[in-house]
């Protein structure tokens, strides 16, 4: 068992429970009893504003901020539970609904079948099996956000993330082969060998810049078609039930307008087909994430095919700086902060001088082409106070952040509006 020893001689072993104070960073050995924050209880709807002096002050300030802010505040939510919580916290819609989790768990087998399909019939069977499951997910999320916009990002990660690890699978098959040859063990199945071939084929040296997002949708067009149909059918079902779904379809990792045009054409055809089949037409916006630097620099062209932009500032920061976030944060960020390369991680607070310029260029050129273009941000920066102020001044329409950061974003959006008004008056 792996262990470490603290300065006072305490030994901590693998599996021991630790508690961490999220404010101070102090670590406690064992499980520390906790009680819900009264402020969180207030936002959850379990505590009235006049029940606690602190809560009363928070209520007063947040209401004042809401009355002053120009920026809308949405949330990043992938489930109906997260969506409902965000709504209680004051979220005005979902700015990012990731669909990746809808392909995990028991559904992973269908993705494997899709990848291993040897013909159109097998591929269609795998997609048909996923359709009702996706539709149920969207019915739940659209229902939780009834009357508010829900921006659904079509599948973004590379397919290999839904497959077994290359090294582990290779070792497993090599061991099985050796046992079969030496001791007459069970032979490796054709399915496992086909799976290994697929994992090798899809393995990438730098998957963040590889076959993902819109590129995946163009290589396997049925995948995006499945998701668009599930969105349309879910919205039609809810509308028949008297609800008011407001879906928005967001295409990830677009770098050229031609990519978006191809996906948009197919999406519009599917939306029209579902409207004809169900007798229900649901107005659905189609837009894109701006997360590739080239997309920001050619935003005027991309706006010709997009009804909205949403900045994916996590990936935009990675590509703009040339950072691989998973590698660099632990490798040298603390040193960069110590020597003053930057004062805070650019993944926590937006780099206004560099990445911020890309944002401003995209806003200006996008709206020059399409004045009604709706623009938001759905990266983690959407809940960062300093970044929220930048987005206000850059002219964005809304920010989107995790449910628990929604109150912070509401407050900072109000402060940004007041500061801007004070500056204008001077």
Question: Where do the model's predicted regions map?
Answer:
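Short, Lys/Arg- and Gly-enriched loop/turn segments at beta-strand edges
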Residues: 24-33
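Conserved alpha/beta-domain cores
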Residues: 39-41, 46-426
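Short, charged low-complexity linker/loop segments at the C-terminal edge of domains
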Residues: 35-37
